[in-house]
A protein has these predicted regions:
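Solvent-exposed alpha-helices and their adjacent loops that cap or buttress functional pockets
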Residues: 1-6, 51-52, 75-77, 125-126, ...
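Catalytic domains of riboflavin
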Residues: 13, 20-22, 43, 124-134, ...
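Feature captures the catalytic cores and cofactor-binding loops of soluble hydro-lyases/lyases
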Residues: 39-72, 76-79, 96-105, 200-291
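N-terminal glycine-rich phosphate/adenylate-binding segment common to multiple enzyme folds
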Residues: 67-140
Length: 291
């Protein structure tokens, strides 16, 4: 049923993971009615349970390529503001997607097929239809990473050197929309994120180090993970996120330090993440943007 008060409603285009649920809870705490566009290929079915127990939540399931259906649903529900939250696997976007006529036309007009170009074009279509796409950190500013160490220990001298190098490399690849994460060991770049995501990149770095010969036993314990926002990060989508699963991937890979960009990276379940990092002896630090 439509809501004539667009300002009292929020559309939530939900991908996978906890991000959509955290944003949903924050929006409901602000008294907003939330209309969820749940992606069949990505969104956790727990979203249905939220709608069952909360009359202020409405869930509509649709496939990733159904742009026209998304717009029609949001307009029917009286939504004039929407957010994107949660990851959508890059391989889903660029290989598994079955676009409707509207999305197919949009894809044909893209100069390059990267995430920024695609989501920016989708945002423009939504805006043209009277639906403003808002920052995905809306209501979640307290979860943005602070400057400085978040854990009991900060980075040591070797890790600080790897952070400085990793920041240069990570910002370079992020500028080309290739990924946001690099893994460094003793001044050498071990792994660079592409389509696989941060945790898979960390896992791959650990596998690479284990596959090396004599020096691996030393270097494996010195893996430093650096994750950054893009130089011109659009906070409406693809904002960097870390959490307890990131720390678990690091622990399994033998990584000892995580550096993220303060004020531009969301830290989910910070208390649990920091506790896990402290237990594993991993340093977690926020670096000032542009620092």
């Amino acid at each position: 049923m439509g809501d004539s008060g667009g300002e009292s409603s929020l559309g939530l285009i939900a991908g996978n993971g906890r991000f959509p649920f955290l944003l949903l809870d924050a929006a409901r705490a602000q008294g907003l009615r939330v209309v969820v566009a749940a992606i069949k290929e990505e969104t956790d079915e727990e979203m249905n349970e939220r709608a069952h127990v909360d009359a202020g939540v409405t869930v509509h399931w649709m496939s990733l390529g159904e742009l026209s259906r998304l717009i029609e649903m949001l307009q029917r529900e009286g939504v004039t503001r929407a957010v994107m939250a949660g990851q959508v696997k890059h391989k889903q976007i660029f290989s598994s997607i079955r676009p409707d006529w509207r999305l197919a036309k949009l894809l044909l007009n893209l100069r390059t097929r990267n995430t920024d170009m695609l989501l920016g074009a989708v945002a423009k279509v939504l805006e043209d239809e009277g639906i403003a796409l808002m920052s995905s950190t809306m209501f979640l500013e307290p979860m943005l990473a602070p400057v400085g160490a978040m854990t009991e220990r900060g980075p040591d001298a070797a890790e600080l050197a790897d952070i400085a190098y990793g920041m240069k490399v990570a910002r370079g690849i992020a500028g080309f929309d290739l990924g946001q994460t690099v893994v460094i060991a003793a001044g050498a770049c071990v792994a660079v994120e592409a389509m696989e995501g941060t945790d898979a990149t960390i896992t791959r770095a650990g596998e690479i180090m284990r596959g090396l010969e004599q020096e691996a036993s030393t270097l494996e314990r010195r893996l430093t993970v650096v994750k950054v926002a893009k130089p011109k990060q659009d906070m409406r989508f693809d904002v960097p996120v870390v959490g307890a699963p990131t720390i678990e991937a690091m622990r399994a890979a033998g990584a000892t330090c995580l550096c993220v960009e303060a004020g531009r990276t969301l830290v989910f379940d910070r208390e649990a993440m920091v506790a896990a990092a402290n237990a594993a002896g991993i340093a977690v630090v926020g670096e000032a943007a542009g620092g």
